[in-house]
Amino acid sequence: MNKSNLRRKVAELFIVRASGFNLDSQRQYPNLEASKENLKRLLEEGVGGVIFLGGTIKELEIRCQIVKKWAAQPLLLCADIEEGVGQRFYGGTHFVPPMGIAQIYKKDNSLGISIAEKIGYFTGKEAKKIGLNLLLAPVCDINNNSNNPVINLRAWGEDPETVKDLTCAYQRGISRSNMLTCAKHFPGHGNSEVDSHLDLPEIKNNLSQLERFELIPFKSLINQGVNSVMVGHLFFPNIDPFYPATLSKRLVNDLLRIKFKYDGLVVTDALLMKAISKKYSSANAAVMAFDAGIDLLLMPEDIDEAIDSLTDAFYSEKISLERLHISIERRKKQLDLIGNENDLEKEELRHEDVKNKFLVDAYRFSNSIIKNSIFVRGESTIKAKVNDINLIQIDNFDQVSNKFFPALNLPKAVGFKNLIIHPLGISPWQKTNKRFLDLGRFGNSKILVQLFVRGKPFIGLDYHNEHWVEAIKNLEIKERLSGIIIYGCPYLYDKIKKNIHESIPLAYSPSQIEE
């Protein structure tokens, strides 16, 4: 095989990031997302996958059709959709974060499992309708560290049994919709306090500890036939003292491939994440990951450099050509499983009346889940007097982007004045004591506190801090507290619940109903 043809074969194993928006000028992260011209070139040169972020569901449907025409072979078209299509693409259904389903599971195991499977089915069907074929989900990490800055609400629970039951149910639902699935982040990102987008997390667990805890959901999903496993950028010095999991033969080849007998696709987490790119070049990371047993290389910082380097490794026989053929065959096998993309099921969803009914059904189901996952302490009613304040802490303007969202609309209907605080806005904290609100800014009004709190990549848990617990306690002492509603993180809800009198109205919801 000449080097040019070899490079095209190697390129099949790479996944490039692109925007779901149609225009280059609309890209949210132009330094991370390939331009239209560059994306077309890469696909014509053989790159085998695209991961999308942003845009509307209609735009993405068009984008998927376009990139398939540019490509030299069938593509893996994927997205990090963990909470429904609407999490990444406007106009899609946005479901409760997985941790919210775990709260339902605690009350009723069967109901939690049923809901998880239906979420998987609706998500897979909706994703298929717009042209995707691989969902980078479910998250199989067990969030047994409440200070985890990046997994947090993305996890399906805090213990192996809960996560195993719910991820298996979710994966069954996606598979029913004829979509490919991905268990991540092997061998477990739950017990970390570092965001791998920013640095390399170090986890002290040895192999026997992992097998008794973190690996249980992965084993179950592998036995259930999950199509791919994503390896996390995680350092386990008691298993491999030299390399992070992504580049570790001990973890990828010896544990996942040989011990677990896994013969599906193994994919890296994004190689441009600082956990890898701080220390390894795109060229070295690609070669080392593949040599460790990886099949698919996701989002290297410099994709051309990575493809060239891996091509050289095969051409010089540093890595055998047999390994290349095995990975290409694994990729083909998974694409063959989902069959003809123009099957009857997808064709049915092209009819607008069927499509609209499906979206309405998914939307109603999403809202019904939220209603099932709301916790209210006691039967207290929050009342407002003139000029009382609805203080909403957000970290994302999408949380209050619709004036009809309950967090805004319901308090306003009973007399509260909405006041939104955001990290980019004016600080509400005292200059001398950052743990207390500057009450002088709020007059003599009583305050309803609503907090949107969740761990997020690159941001972490900035608002899951003790200062909110203390600030709310101070409001209670000064008799300025009307009530508290926590959205997202159940850990903050638990702390506040223990710290304030039971007469204070208190509620928790993993999300808000969009109606």
Protein language model regions, located:
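Preference for extracellular/luminal or secreted protein segments
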Residues: 1-40, 45-46, 258, 282-515
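Short, well-ordered coil/turn segments that N-cap beta-strands
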Residues: 10-12, 46-48, 72-75, 132-133, ...
